[in-house]
C-alpha cells in the first residue's frame, strides 16, 4: 500500500489535478500513473501524452483534495478494538492554500477500512486540530508503539 500525491497549482488558474490517493497492488513494479496521471484517470496536461492513464492501476481509495497525507500506517497493535487491526491510518497534514469558499481539509488522522484488499470506508479517526479557522496542529507522522498505542 502506498500513498500517491497529486500535483497542485497547475496551469494559469492554479488548479489542482485530482486528489491524493491510496494505491495498492499484488507486487512491485506496478504503474500507478504518477506523474502522468492523478487519481488513476486524470491526465496531467504538463506531460501531454507521455503516459497513458488507461494502463494505470486505479487507486484503492481517493483521499480529500489538499488533505496532504504525509504518513500511512497499518494498525498492528492490540490496544484498540480488534476491528482496527490491519486497517490503514493516514496522517493528513492539512490544506493551507485552498480558497475560503472551498474550506480546509485534512488536519486529522483518517481511517481507511479494508475488507480484504478492498477499501470499504474512508472516515475521520482523530480530529480536533482545526477549530473553525484556527489551526491547533497538523499531523505529520504516525507510530504504533509496542504497547499498541498510536503516537
Where are these regions (language model features)?
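Beta-propeller domain segments
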Residues: 1-126, 131-137, 145-147, 151
Amino acid at each position: 500500500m502506498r500513498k500517491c500525491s497529486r500535483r497542485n497549482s497547475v496551469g494559469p488558474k492554479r488548479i489542482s489535478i485530482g486528489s491524493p490517493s491510496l494505491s495498492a497492488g499484488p507486487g512491485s513494479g506496478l504503474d500507478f500513473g504518477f506523474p502522468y496521471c492523478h487519481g488513476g484517470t486524470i491526465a496531467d496536461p504538463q506531460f501531454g501524452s507521455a503516459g497513458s492513464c488507461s494502463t494505470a492501476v486505479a487507486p484503492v481509495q481517493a483521499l480529500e483534495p489538499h488533505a496532504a497525507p504525509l504518513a500511512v500506517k497499518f494498525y498492528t497493535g492490540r490496544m484498540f478494538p480488534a476491528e482496527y487491526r490491519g486497517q490503514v491510518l493516514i496522517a493528513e497534514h492539512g490544506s493551507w492554500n485552498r480558497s475560503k469558499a472551498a474550506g480546509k481539509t485534512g488536519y486529522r488522522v483518517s481511517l481507511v477500512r479494508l475488507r480484504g484488499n478492498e477499501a470499504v470506508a474512508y472516515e475521520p479517526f482523530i480530529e480536533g486540530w482545526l477549530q473553525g479557522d484556527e489551526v491547533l496542529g497538523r499531523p505529520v507522522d504516525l507510530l504504533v508503539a509496542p504497547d499498541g498505542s498510536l503516537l
